[in-house]
Amino acid sequence: MKNRGFNTHRHGDGSTVVPPAAEVHLRDTMGELPLLYAAADIAIVGGSLIEIKGIGGHNLLEPCAVATPVLFGRYISDFLEISHNIVERAAGIQVHDSNDLRDTLKKLLNDAALRNRMGANGIQVIKENRGATQRTLELCIPLIESDVLVREH
């Protein structure tokens, strides 16, 4: 990114001061993403762009929850259903290679109205998926109370 003329900052390499002119933030830490997603114009879920053994992607709902359009790659095996929902609802875009990522970023960076629509769509995705734990419990409780799930000793 520096080679392309962007002011960058990498957090997690020991530095604690964020340069005021930083345009691109690379984070390699835990617990900071929700705040950063809320401040961002676009979120790129980088862990989905490359195959990482034992990792099936990263949470695509976090950017949606703060109305930030999300871009992600193909390595999302743990989030297939929600990724399809995000794409269908136009809250995010799955990119297929570096050229696709570049072109999609250019398009979004130059179209604030599109980013705003995608952000609003992301909030809708979150609203539609609330209550998943309750729905899961409603499906599981009858099984637990029946003889279907009996531990054999």
Which stretches of residues belong to each language-model region?
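Nucleotide-activated sugar donor-binding and catalytic core shared by glycosyltransferases
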Residues: 1-153
